[in-house]
Design a protein with these regions (language model features):
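A short glycine-rich, Lys/Arg-flanked "PGG" loop and its adjoining helix->strand segment in the class I
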Residues: 15-30
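Conserved beta-strand signature within the Rossmann-like core of class I S-adenosyl-L-methionine
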Residues: 28-36, 234-238
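Short, glycine-/aromatic-enriched active-site segment of Class I SAM-dependent methyltransferases
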Residues: 33-56, 60-62
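Flexible, glycine-/basic-rich loop-and-beta segments that form/coincide
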Residues: 83-132
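N-terminal Rossmann NAD(P)H-binding glycine-rich loop of SDR-like oxidoreductase domains
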Residues: 251-269
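NAD(P)H-binding glycine-rich loop region in Rossmannoid oxidoreductase-like domains
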Residues: 294-334
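Catalytic helix-loop patch of NAD(P)-dependent Rossmann-fold dehydrogenases
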Residues: 326-341, 354, 363-409, 416-422
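C-terminal substrate-binding subdomain of Rossmann-fold SDR/epimerase-dehydratase oxidoreductases
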Residues: 433-561
Length: 561
């Protein structure tokens, strides 16, 4: 017997090598040869298999040609997963009567290779293109990790891994250390200048992410490094497709800088968190954030493909009614079309990602006085904000009902917290109270105060979202309180809580003690918005799942100032 293992692809003249083996092999002897399999390399995007010492890359088609020229017959072929996919071929001399050529197996494999396109140069162009896609995801993610002030190290300084580091142009600027269990490598550097440290050194101060270069041993590494994963660390596997793995599922929060998102991040501690924001970058310790315009569909799909989230909590939207009124096309894109794009990406990719879409009670506001029911399709919209939100809401239901995807709408009623933007009424009022108490007696101008609002604290909304995405299937839920409050009464109470008692005369609210005007009510500020509304509901489904609001209106008002 003659064996040649993991070296056949290094030969400058493989036919002559085979003839030399023929010359030393017994008449009924066997030559066994094992090396990486070309089709496995192509299928798994193993660009790291291509390195300086490899001159050839074989499928059975090429090996059969070599065997024929050297007067060998192939008696068996076996495949395995070693190093990303290898095959072992067993040869016998053609004149041997002890072994027969396995024509049925050979023809079956050759047909599979030809059907795959092994004789067509396009498959190699496609291979490089696919590898470049995965490497770009890796490269971009490493950049994001560093922008977030987090740490990513290399795991396993292997030969193939060094090929990937060079191809992706990843060096010591991107990753401070490479972690290695082989003591002979510790203290040295990778080809791109990354210092190699031991595993125990890494465990004393573990990074947030480990880029696994020996990715072929994925399952063994996940088991071996369970402690790292359980402590919150995450693995990055570059191939066959870029993937981030942790012990927790991944949740992606769009609109990660918003008010509700702040409380979602506190609530979703059982997830590895990722965020998408559009404002000035704000990087945090408990979440990895991406900042870009989500209306760029190519960047959006690229980012989602990097994260491959188990859950998407879609909160991003234009929230200002005034801005939406003056920018209807932009509002339709941000609050409607963007939701549809997220649904479409998940569907086309074949993911089983759960989606929570932040819908709004504003989609029923045109009814003026209305009690919203569960699964209520009687939307009535008179404003660009609610028109766009209705579109997003409807697209979520379309993808859920037609394709059976786990997509949910949460119809969120008025949400308050101290983190709400100051342009919104109650926060505008509290800021005015602070100014008034500090001696600035300027008058506050507001719109109609006769509407009723069903008000929740943002933390209760976050808990509702967690309850919703914990369900196996998608649905539509009302996220609301059991009672509504007149806006006028809330404004009066806020001032009263801080010793400013107001009286009303016509459209003026003045301070009883001084007679100074405090508020001017402008009823016709925005046309139809001047009409008092009372949109209410009952969160029947959520309460059946055990959710209920925990923060009462007194606490909400108390937090605001």
């Amino acid at each position: 017997m003659v064996s040649s293992i993991s070296m056949f692809y290094d030969l400058p003249d493989p036919v002559q090598f085979a003839k030399d083996i023929y010359s030393v092999l017994d008449t009924d002897g066997i030559w066994t040869c094992e090396q990486s399999y070309l089709l496995s390399m192509l299928r798994t995007n193993s660009i790291d298999t291509i390195c300086h010492e490899h001159l050839e890359y074989y499928s059975l088609y090429q090996v059969k040609e070599i065997a024929d020229r050297a007067n060998f017959k192939i008696i068996d072929v076996k495949f395995n997963d070693c190093n990303g996919g290898s095959f072992r071929i067993y040869f016998a001399k053609r004149e041997s009567t002890l072994y027969n050529e396995n024509c049925e197996l050979i023809n079956k494999i050759l047909k599979e290779e030809i059907d795959y396109g092994i004789l067509n140069d396009n498959i190699f162009e496609n291979f490089l293109s696919d590898c470049d896609i995965e490497v770009k995801r890796l490269r971009d993610f490493v950049d994001i990790v560093n922008k977030n002030g987090k740490k990513i190290y290399v795991y396993g300084a292997s030969t193939k891994g060094n090929c990937l580091l060079q191809y992706a142009n990843l060096c010591e600027v991107d990753m401070k250390y490479a972690v290695e269990r082989n003591p002979k490598k510790i203290g040295k550097m990778t080809n791109t200048g990354i210092k190699i440290i031991g595993e125990e050194t890494m465990r004393e101060n573990p990074p947030d992410y480990l880029l696994v270069l020996p990715w072929h041993f994925r399952e063994e590494i996940i088991v071996r490094e369970k402690e790292f994963l359980d402590a919150g660390g995450q693995f990055v596997f570059p191939f066959p497709h870029f993937e981030i793995i942790g012990s927790k599922p991944k949740a992606l929060i769009s609109g990660c800088d918003g008010m509700i998102a702040h409380y979602v991040k506190d609530c979703f501690t059982d997830y590895n968190l990722y965020g998408i924001g559009h404002s000035e970058p704000n990087y945090e310790t408990n979440i990895t954030n991406f900042y870009f315009d989500m209306n760029n569909s190519n960047t959006l799909e690229h980012t989602l493909s990097i994260i491959k989230p188990d859950v998407i909590i879609h909160l991003a939207s234009i929230s200002s009614s005034h801005y939406a009124f003056n920018n209807p096309i932009e509002t339709l894109r941000c609050n409607g079309l963007l939701t549809a794009q997220i649904c479409d990406i998940i569907h086309r990719k074949g993911w089983n990602t759960k989606l929570f879409n932040a819908s709004s009670s504003e989609i029923y506001k045109g009814h003026i006085d209305y009690s919203v029911k569960e699964n209520d399709h009687n939307m009535f919209h008179l404003h660009p904000y609610s028109i766009a939100k209705t579109m997003g809401h409807s697209m979520v239901e379309f993808y859920r009902n037609v394709y059976g995807l786990p997509f949910s709408n949460g119809v969120i009623f008025t949400t308050e917290s101290p983190l709400k933007k100051p342009v919104f009424l109650l926060n505008k009022v509290t800021n005015h109270i602070k100014e008034w108490k500090n001696g600035n007696k300027s008058v506050l101008q507001v719109g109609n105060l006769d509407s009723y609002r069903n008000i929740l604290h943002a933390s209760d909304v976050a808990n509702a979202i967690h309850t919703i995405v914990s369900q196996k299937n998608g649905d539509t839920y009302l996220i609301c309180n059991s009672e509504s409050h007149k806006v006028y009464d809330l404004v009066i109470k806020l001032y009263s809580n801080y010793g400013i008692e107001l009286e009303k005369k016509d459209n003026i609210l003045y301070e009883r003690a001084t007679g100074l005007d405090v508020i001017i009510i402008q009823d016709k500020q925005l046309g139809f918005d001047s009409i008092p509304t009372n949109i209410r509901g009952e969160a029947t489904k959520l309460r059946e799942l055990g959710w209920k609001p925990l923060v009462n209106i007194e606490t909400i008002l108390g937090e605001l100032v």
